[in-house]
Amino acid sequence: MSDMNKILQKWGASLRKGTDFDSWGQLVEAIDEYQILARQLQKEAQSPANSSDFTEDQKKTIGKIATCLELRSAALQYTQSQEGFTLEDVKKLEPILSSILTFNKEFPFDVQPVPLRRILAPGEEENLEVEEEEEDGGAGAGSPDLFPARVPGTLLPRLPSEPGMTLLTIKIEKIGLKDAGQCIDPYITVSVKDLNGIDLTPVQDTPMAVRKEDTYVHFNVEIEIQKHVEKLTKGAAIFFEFKHYKPKKRFTSTKCFAFMEMDEIRSGQIVIELYKKPTDFKRKRLQLLTKKPLYLHLLQTLLKD
């Protein structure tokens, strides 16, 4: 079996796994599977011609499938809506993905691949960003209409309750930044890491900010932490990475990050400090972003059955 056929077989198995979870009503698992596959497909769709065995037309179709998976994930997150991308729609993607090498029909959905924004490994962007303060200062000068909106965030629904277990909901209210108004397509990536920087839960992206004013970017969005508080390992932390699009470089960059440790989990409002990138998941070399009183503003809600 060729390498390409092995890749297609792997993608097909992942898609079927996602639709199985979807049909069984296991929404958290379905969203997670769809998101994992979508990222794999996006990475292939964005790969340079000299490092991919797929043609440009095939990569465009792969990118469209990734967009459809993002749309289904978004539909599952907002289950009260009767509209959006359906499970039956996703199932129509299976024969397209399996026959991508010979597929020559019109794509059944009016979608476009996620915009070609670079996917960078952690820390890679640091080698590309020179004179950042100067560059960021002009980043907001152009019309935001020039830059396509991101696919909706990858927020996951609340976990089922368990006797004696505590669920944590964190509302991201706003973040304080001196150049808040210049950030393009800002969003926050939320992850839960152990002391070694290993993920303890699925990573979630918020939708884009709802508004920007003065020195604040407002989100007003709730994140459901995907593990009961009692099951989080000692030394774990919840990370918040603020990201925005850099049009001159054509990639999405982490501007700063914040984190909350286990002893800070309690009901009510909390403000936490912002740190300079790159994101230090092991929390060993932390540098404050600014001496100004600018923070990430959160509201925590604990729910115990």
Curated annotation (Swiss-Prot):
Residues 126-137 have a biased composition (Acidic residues). One of its GO terms (molecular function) is phosphatidylinositol binding. Residues 126-146 are annotated as: Disordered. Residues 156-303 form the C2 Aida-type domain. Residues 153-220 are annotated as: Axin-binding. Keywords: Developmental protein. GO terms for biological process: determination of ventral identity; dorsal/ventral pattern formation; negative regulation of JNK cascade; negative regulation of protein-containing complex assembly. One of its GO terms (cellular component) is membrane. The keyword Methyltransferase does not apply. PROSITE patterns: C2_AIDA. Belongs to the AIDA family. Acts as a ventralizing factor during embryogenesis. Inhibits axin-mediated JNK activation by binding axin and disrupting axin homodimerization. This in turn antagonizes a Wnt/beta-catenin-independent dorsalization pathway activated by axin/JNK-signaling. PANTHER family: AXIN INTERACTOR, DORSALIZATION-ASSOCIATED PROTEIN. This is Axin interactor, dorsalization-associated protein B. It comes from Xenopus laevis. The gene is aida-b.
